[in-house]
Amino acid sequence: MTDQADAAMPIKFTDAAAAKVKGLLEEEQNPALKLRVYVTGGGCSGFQYGFTFDEKVNEGDFTVEKQGVQLVVDPMSLQYLVGGEVDYTSGLEGSRFFVKNPNATTTCGCGASFSV
């Protein structure tokens, strides 16, 4: 995908996140799995991010494909994530998927919850 096409996407899926998903799918030996990111009520800031692996894409889901793997977002969650980026980090504090969300007005210290 070109940078221009990437910029037109409502949510970005970084190379680091796609590479990690690809590695996890190889470990699981299930190429049908997709990384699903979603938003639910809760957390210390009002909303929280969730990540899970899912084999299916539901009607209305938005998908982004990179490096042969897919990121899936349901329509309700997408409205809170437009302009955001799903990334992956690994460091001294551990490894995790996370969302860089320009719509978040506040976030908690761990970055797992936010408010708009």
From Swiss-Prot:
Swiss-Prot/TrEMBL GO biological process terms: iron-sulfur cluster assembly
Protein known as: Iron-sulfur cluster insertion protein ErpA
GO cellular component, one term: cytosol
Keyword annotations: Iron, Iron-sulfur, Metal-binding
Residues engaged in binding iron-sulfur cluster: C44, C108, C110
Function: Required for insertion of 4Fe-4S clusters for at least IspG.
Subunit structure: Homodimer.
NCBIfam families: iron-sulfur cluster assembly accessory protein (TIGR00049), PRK13623.1 (NF010147)
Co-factor requirement: iron-sulfur cluster
Chain's gene name: erpA
Family: Belongs to the HesB/IscA family.
GO MF terms, alphabetically ordered: 2 iron, 2 sulfur cluster binding; 4 iron, 4 sulfur cluster binding; iron ion binding
PANTHER family noted in UniProt: IRON-SULFUR CLUSTER ASSEMBLY 2 HOMOLOG, MITOCHONDRIAL (PTHR43011:SF1)
Cofactor note: Binds 1 iron-sulfur cluster per subunit.
Pfam hit, one: Fe-S_biosyn
